[in-house]
Amino acid sequence: MITSLKITTALIKRRRPDFEFTLFRDTPVTPLCRPLNKCKLAIVTTGGLYLKTDRPFDPSLKDGDCSYRVLPGDINFENLMISHKWYNHKFIHADLNCLFPIDRMKEYVQKGVIKSLSEEHYSFMGHIYDTVPLMRHAKKVGKRLKDLDVDVAFLTPA
């Protein structure tokens, strides 16, 4: 049986035969210790979103762009750009909430499903071959989310 993972693996191996997948078999799961209506939430995406005033991600880097961008909590979609070329943007251009569901999360706050949203959200690039620098940046973002008293990171992969 051919799965999308096998197809993806074959495509990556064709472009980068030296690439070794990172397996996270021992990733700790952190259970949610309180109900969502008592939690502060931040969105973290791998969609390559950035503010028009920021430096775009560089999709031409051999191992991928491992940096991240801060997206303010009061973001206006008109100020966002996408520099990720490894997925179809058709639906994202139709409704950016498909990738960055800030409007849906605001509705959940109004309905009392979530206590609040973070002052900052984060965007990474997907399609990363060298995960070592990515892990360094992810730890910085994790620390920043803790400093902001964020309880839940809602990941939207691209």
Question: Across the structure, where does each feature detected by a protein language model lie?
Answer:
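Metallocofactor- and cofactor-centric catalytic cores in central/energy metabolism, strongly enriched
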Residues: 1-158
